[in-house]
Each structure stands twice: as C-alpha cells, then as structure tokens.
C-alpha cells in the first residue's frame, strides 16, 4: 500500500509506501488521515518518519513524554490556550532541517544577490543556535538557482528540485533530513521563531504567517513553509507549471485541501523583510514590471482537479549544471550549497509556450 503518487525524478523513481506494520485510517470526527502501528497500538496524525517507522515503541514513549510535558506547562500557566498555534512546539534533537531557497539574480532591481549575501550568514547563525541548544541535530541550506534560460522564474519547480536533491543527499550523507522548510531569500527569521523551525511538522507549518506584508491574508501560504517528507509527497509537491511570480502557493493550498491536510503556524514572531515593502508597494512594483508575473496563473489553477497528482514531484525533470559551496566549512563540513539547474520544460504542457522571460499576453 502506498500513500502518494509515484515520483519519477531526474535520476530515480521512488514511491511512498506505508512502512511495514503501519496502517492508514481516516478520522470520522476530524475527517483527516491518521497512521496506526498495529503491534505497539501507537497512533499519530503524520506519516511516519524513517526513525518512527523503525522504532514505533520508542516513538510512542517519546510522544507520550512530550504530551505530558506540554500538559504540565499548560496546567501551570495562567493563560488559557485555545489554539495549537499559541503553544510552544515540541522540538527534538533527532531532527535535521533542510532549508530550500529558490533563487535567481536576473533583474538588478530585485537585489537578490545582495539578499543572498545577507541570508547565508544570518541563517547559519540562526540554525547553529538550534543545534547548540540541542533543539535539532543538524541542518543544511540549499540555494536552488534557475539558470539564465530565457524563461520566467519557476518558484514551484525550483522548490521541488530542492526537495528532491536534499532528500537524496541526506540519504547518502546522514543524518537524513526530517524537516523541509521552503524559504524565500529575502526573509530573515529572528530567534523568537526558532522553535517553529526546530519542531517536526506533524502538519505543515506556515511560519511566514507572522510576516507583516501578508499577516492579514488568511489565504496566503508562501514565504516560509515547513513540511514533512510524507506530507510533501502526499500532495505531489509544488506544481511545475507556474512560470513567473504568483500562483504556485495558491495551488499548494488547493492540494492540501484536496487530501485534507490542515496546516498550522505561529501567531507571533519576528521576520525581517529585506525587500522592505508593504503589500501595496510590492503590487505597484510588479505592476511596473508586468513581465515578471505569471501570465497563466488562473488557467493553471483551473486545471487543479485533473492534474495535481501528475504535476509536481511525479513528473519532475531537471539537470544540475553546477554545484558550489557558499560558506566557509564548519569543522570541515559545508552548511550551504548552491545548485544551478536547468529546470527544463514540462513535457507537452500548454504553458511551455508562455514561459518566455519577456512573455506578455496579446491585447
């Protein structure tokens, strides 16, 4: 039994089988899937990680302990908690984080090279604190750069490539990543969000919910989002067919809703926006540069029902053109890697004809 689509990646074919001894059910009360280990009688909401699959009894004990600790903290608090978003998330020093950043420095006015120069040292410092405080085991930063291919920026496909590469790399060079955080290069989290990075996402975590620009938009699901491997594969990742700014996050929300995955996020925390634009300014900036926008957004969203399970990780194709380190080695180990990739066209998809970097629809 499997729990997702087949993934025909750039080099290998993988599936998402439910681990031996585990079963999947649907909660009638909450109308969402859960996972059950028959022998230990352990139940959890999220797809089992490799560690959980191999040691369900230990997982059951650990989760019981974490729940007891949270209950003690809640009982001793004078503030009543009404939402999981207001609680301190549970962290584990078994977790390894992959920070996956889509990137291209094509338009000087976007200042992406300047943003990257600030992003790498900040994130290394931020994540190293989580390691030294024993909240996570390890991390690696992956900058996925789209080559100068004369096509519009394809954020969704770059994130899929980053996920695919990071997973394969960590399988060969343990520890295996358990947390995948899809991250914009111009957003710098501050220490008050550290635990939201370190916690295993039993359901997706929209960390950028607290970003000032979109904090009043409940439909926004971009900026910084944390996923487990299992949930990312269940929804077949991001769409590959959104060329230009906008739309891929909306499609991601549709995928979560289709497979009945709920998401969470902090209600407070600090993010420094290197662009330093409010929503009105950003929209005005894009209006002045219409060719950057996705000109197929609405048509691509309309085909969600018929294409979501075959447009994403399942048909991902790309070539790695260059791989380089972006940092000085820490104890002989680099913590930041840039991949320059050829994202390739998507089979015979109709949007291939509308992905040129200067494409605008005819009036």
PLM segments and residue spans:
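Short beta-strand-to-loop acidic/aromatic patch adjacent to the donor-nucleotide binding site
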Residues: 172-190
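Conserved donor-nucleotide/metal-binding helix-loop-beta segment in metal-dependent transferases, i.e.
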Residues: 190-214
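Short, well-formed alpha-helical segments that are part of the catalytic scaffolds
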Residues: 106-127
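WW-domain-binding short linear motifs
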Residues: 1-33, 38-85
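C-terminal catalytic/acceptor-binding lobe
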Residues: 119, 244, 250-363
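A recurrent flexible, glycine/aromatic-enriched loop bordering the glycosyltransferase active site
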Residues: 210-227, 234, 243-244
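Active-site-proximal specificity loops/subdomain of glycosyltransferases
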Residues: 131-177
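Hydrophobic targeting segments
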Residues: 95-101, 123, 140-142, 162
């Amino acid at each position: 039994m499997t729990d997702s689509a087949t993934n025909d990646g750039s080099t290998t074919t993988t599936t998402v089988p439910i681990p031996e001894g585990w079963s999947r059910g649907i909660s009638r009360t909450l109308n969402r899937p859960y996972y059950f280990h028959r022998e230990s009688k352990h139940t959890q909401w999220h797809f089992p990680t490799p560690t959980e699959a191999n040691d369900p009894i230990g997982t059951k004990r650990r989760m019981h302990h974490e729940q007891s600790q949270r209950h003690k903290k809640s009982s001793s608090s004078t503030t009543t908690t009404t939402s999981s978003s207001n609680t301190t998330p549970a962290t584990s020093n078994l977790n390894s984080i992959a920070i996956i950043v889509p990137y291209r420095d094509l338009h000087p006015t976007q200042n992406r090279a300047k943003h990257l120069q600030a992003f790498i040292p900040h994130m290394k410092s931020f994540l190293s604190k989580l390691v030294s405080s024993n909240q996570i085991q390890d991390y690696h930063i992956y900058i996925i750069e789209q080559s100068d291919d004369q096509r519009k920026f394809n954020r969704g496909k770059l994130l899929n490539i980053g996920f695919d590469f990071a997973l394969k790399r960590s399988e060969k060079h343990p520890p295996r990543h358990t947390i995948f955080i899809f991250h914009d290069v111009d957003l710098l989290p501050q220490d008050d969000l550290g635990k939201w990075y370190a916690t295993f996402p039993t359901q997706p975590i929209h960390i950028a919910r607290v970003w000032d620009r979109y904090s009043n938009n409940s439909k926004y699901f971009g900026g910084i989002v944390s996923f487990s491997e299992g949930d990312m594969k269940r929804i077949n990742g991001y769409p590959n067919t959104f060329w230009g700014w906008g739309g891929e996050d909306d499609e991601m929300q549709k995928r979560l809703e289709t497979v009945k995955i709920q998401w969470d996020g902090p209600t407070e925390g600090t993010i420094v926006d290197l662009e330093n634009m409010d929503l009105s300014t950003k929209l005005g900036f894009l209006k002045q540069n219409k060719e950057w926008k996705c000109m197929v957004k609405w048509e691509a969203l309309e085909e969600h029902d018929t294409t979501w399970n075959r447009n994403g990780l399942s048909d991902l194709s790309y070539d790695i053109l260059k791989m380089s380190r972006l940092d000085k080695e820490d104890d002989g180990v680099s913590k930041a890697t840039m991949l320059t990739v050829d994202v390739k066209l998507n089979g015979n998809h109709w949007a291939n004809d509308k992905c040129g970097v200067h494409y605008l629809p005819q009036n």
